């Protein structure tokens, strides 16, 4: 467990691997490093992996005021500079993809793999976003993640949105009202988009639109799965990553 000060906040992250290109794992809303830990374990043989808690989540300090999507991008850039990372590979889920996409618009990125990517505005209210972006009742995860599911239940789900701090509620309002669509045509890194075709939080039409507008994006679907397909099918997800990143192995 490591901590570093970024934008004046105490930030938790886990670093693994000793050689290779550098990968940043960016979790979804209401989640933390644990959600991406199995990906880090898989990739650390060939990459240097940074798995971080966004400000306001996990073990990282909460911002003093509501942040926008751009604030999170600025945070990520400062983290990258502190750790002397050049042209990172970004792997994200949901909210993490929202940050990754705008980061790739503003700063150099080598490649991205984005699952359940958020960023295109959908006609929903705040309460809906808070419900679908966090785990409800712990019934989403399959057996390999039962222990993780219990941990998440204590901090997420139907009660979490009611008890979320004013800062995080304000943050979510700002972030979900930021539309990445006008920037997609200028996001040039090779990007793999992975969506469950039953995703209700970020419906597959969003992935199709991103694939259409981004010059180097490819969309694949996990049939019959939802917004958390990467957790429901971890082995399949890692095999997809392996095929996508194998040419970059150290």
Regions found by a protein language model. Name each.
Residues 125-189:
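Conserved alpha/beta-hydrolase catalytic His-Asp/Glu region
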Residues 187, 193-195, 199:
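Short beta-strand/loop motif that positions the catalytic acidic residue
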Residues 225-234, 238:
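Catalytic histidine-centered segment of alpha/beta-hydrolase-like enzymes
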Residues 1-23, 44-47, 85-86, 110, ...:
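Alpha/beta-hydrolase fold catalytic core
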Residues 98-143:
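Flexible "cap/lid" loop of the alpha/beta hydrolase fold
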Residues 189, 203-210:
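Short alpha-helix in the alpha/beta-hydrolase fold that links the catalytic acid
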Residues 14, 51-91, 239:
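Active-site loop/oxyanion-hole signature of alpha/beta-hydrolase fold enzymes
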Residues 9, 14-59:
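Conserved HGGG/HGGXW glycine-rich cap/lid loop of the alpha/beta-hydrolase fold
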